[in-house]
Design a protein with these regions (language model features):
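Expand to "…catalyze enediolate/carbanion chemistry for C-C bond making/breaking, isomerization
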Residues: 6, 133, 140
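Active-site-adjacent beta->alpha loops and helix N-cap segments on the catalytic face
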Residues: 57-73, 88-93, 114-137
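Active-site gating/metal-coordination segments in enzymes
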Residues: 96-117
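Non-catalytic positions within long, well-ordered alpha-helices that form the structural scaffold/packing
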Residues: 47-48, 101, 134
Length: 145
């Protein structure tokens, strides 16, 4: 593991305890407006001091999190359909590693649908994401659903 990967992981996982408290607010990308998260900036900001990292989508990061935020960002890079489509679990890559780098994220997150109809598709897209992220020293988090 290279220095960049170690450094990014050390931002997310407390080196002294090996633990982390991740605040995930990426639900709106497929669930639509989520009760309590309609005003994401107002909801998230007071909770940031208690979080070791914040997982969210590219749009939420750009529009609701200030650049002065020092909480490590885990960027959701998978998606596809919304609750309006019966193929909700058919996800793919939605954000490039170049965008992740431009946004200065500490890690990326990708949903894999274990046991679902599209399990193979999500696993293959996940491995592509891992390969691309490793080129830049960016950790990849598998989110199981």
């Amino acid at each position: 593991m290279d220095w960049g990967m170690k450094n990014r992981l050390a931002r997310i996982i407390r080196p002294k305890t090996g633990r982390t408290l991740m605040f995930a607010v990426d639900h709106g990308y497929f669930m639509g407006p989520t009760s309590g998260l309609e005003k994401l900036d107002e909801t998230v900001k007071p909770l940031l001091p208690y979080a070791d990292s914040l997982m969210l989508t590219r749009g939420a990061l750009r529009y609701y999190v200030t650049a002065e935020t020092d909480v490590p960002i885990i960027l959701r890079v998978s998606g596809g359909t919304s609750i309006l489509n019966k193929q909700l679990l058919h996800e793919g890559i939605t954000v490039s590693m170049e965008d992740a780098l431009r946004l200065n994220v500490s890690a990326v997150a990708f949903s894999i649908m274990v046991g679902a109809e599209y399990e193979r598709d999500t696993l293959l897209a996940f491995t592509q994401t891992v390969d691309k992220a490793e080129r830049y020293g960016i950790p990849t988090l598998a989110v199981t659903a």
